[in-house]
Amino acid sequence: NAYGGTAGSADDISNRLITTQNLGKTTVAELGSSMGKVIPTAAMYGVNLNNLASAYVTTTKNGIATAESTTYINSMLNELGKSGSTASDTLKKKTGQSFKELMDSGMSLTDVLGILQESADASGKSMADMFSSQEAGKAAATLVQHATDFNGAMDQMQQSAGTTATAFETVENTTAT
């Protein structure tokens, strides 16, 4: 509900959740019990479901459990969006736009985090230094260090149509024999 109609139909959402499960180290059940805690924050800052699901793929694939990923991603999004935070102020200074404006313009999370990484590198800081909480810093660092995973997941989210039907057919064929 936090996304309104922008997340797509129930089938579209199901396709993306199954794709997240298939690419990451999580289950649809774990996502179902965790994602609701971060979706309002994501929606508030213009982070669409493809970006959010790709963040889950990347964090869980790289050893962060689903529930922890929720906490880390939520912390990261809050700091990126909260005026006065180092991350938010750096984005505004470098681009002239807020985090939400950057997301609304079509940038991905890794595009935005790449801007922060460049700024951190230029000032001799780490990505973790751009965030006040360890959780937010860990999420950001994981997404930047594994941007290839994130970008691959984003591509798969775009092509996820039919994933639910395929999964259903697999279950049907498995139980039929």
Language-model features, listed with the residues they occupy:
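Carboxylate/His-rich catalytic cores and anion/metal-binding grooves
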Residues: 1-6
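Amphipathic/coiled-coil alpha-helical interface segments used
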Residues: 7-81, 85-105, 110-177
